[in-house]
Each structure stands twice: as structure tokens, then as C-alpha cells.
């Protein structure tokens, strides 16, 4: 006779997942202050919108949770994805990067480099990576954020 392994209730699993201590990336004191409903200091109004949407939808997340990734030539580095989210149904961690200055060519180059590193580490958009983006003329669309969260995190 087989024994069915116990599966933690979603609420307990999320509670334990959220309780993991970590040190995120520091934000310089002279930077503008943006705070989420949970009281986290984030880097932009758009990140407030994403964080508060995740919270409202009951999706557990960590802001700028450190992630060690391999670089070329046997090197590695610690990255701080904007959000590390937990899909409670699958128990998978999904990264969410928001690219908020896509009309700045230097920013775009750095974003492309980051995406290349993610892909080298097996983290692909639509699988373990959600990408949102905006420009000055095409700001963040809240409905799109909700749809992305629903599609990948529910």
C-alpha cells in the first residue's frame, strides 16, 4: 500500500516561503521614496503597482531577493530580480523583471544583457520569467500587470 505524501496547505507553504530571511539590494537614501502597501521601499511607482497588484491577488512575492547566476568564463554574480513570485498551484518560483526606462538606450542595452544572462541560466520569458516594460510615451498598463499575474502566477 502506498502512502500519499503530506502536502502543506497553500497558506502554510506561502507563510514559510515568505519567512525565509534575506538581504535585498540597498536603495540609496537620496533616491525618491516609493512604498508598497506592505511597507517595502521600492525603486519606482511602477514597482509599487506591481507589488500591490500581487498582494491584492494573494500572490506571495519577495522584492529583490538575491539570486546567484552563472556568467561566461566560469564566473558567477548575484542578481536581484525585481520580484521573485510564488505560484502556489505549482509551487514554482517565477521571476518578474520590470523594465521601466525602455526609451533610454543605455538602459535597454543593460536590460538585454540581463535577459541574456537569465537565458544562459535556463530562465526564459514565459516560463520562469515575466517581463513588463514601459517608456515615457507608453506607461505601465495596470490591466496588463493583472493579466500577466493571472496567466503565470495562478
Which residues does each PLM region occupy?
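Active-site metal-binding core of divalent-cation-utilizing nuclease and nuclease-like domains
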Residues: 40-42, 55, 60-90
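Short beta-strand-loop-alpha-helix junction that forms the active-site gateway
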Residues: 80-113
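C-terminal structured domain segments
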Residues: 102, 106-125, 136
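Basic, glycine-rich
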Residues: 119-154
Amino acid at each position: 500500500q502506498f502512502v500519499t505524501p503530506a502536502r502543506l496547505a497553500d497558506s502554510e507553504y506561502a507563510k514559510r516561503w515568505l519567512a525565509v530571511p534575506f538581504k535585498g539590494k540597498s536603495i540609496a537614501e537620496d533616491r525618491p521614496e516609493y512604498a508598497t502597501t506592505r511597507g517595502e521601499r521600492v525603486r519606482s511607482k511602477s514597482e509599487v503597482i506591481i507589488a500591490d497588484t500581487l498582494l491584492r491577488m494573494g500572490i506571495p512575492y519577495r522584492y529583490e531577493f538575491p539570486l546567484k547566476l552563472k556568467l561566461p568564463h566560469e564566473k558567477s554574480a548575484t542578481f536581484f530580480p525585481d520580484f521573485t513570485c510564488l505560484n502556489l498551484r505549482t509551487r514554482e518560483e517565477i521571476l518578474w523583471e520590470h523594465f521601466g526606462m525602455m526609451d533610454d538606450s543605455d538602459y535597454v542595452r543593460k536590460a538585454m544583457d540581463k535577459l541574456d544572462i537569465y537565458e544562459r541560466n535556463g530562465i526564459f520569458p514565459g516560463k520562469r520569467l515575466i517581463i513588463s516594460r514601459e517608456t515615457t510615451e507608453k506607461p505601465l498598463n495596470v490591466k496588463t500587470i493583472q493579466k500577466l499575474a493571472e496567466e503565470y502566477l495562478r
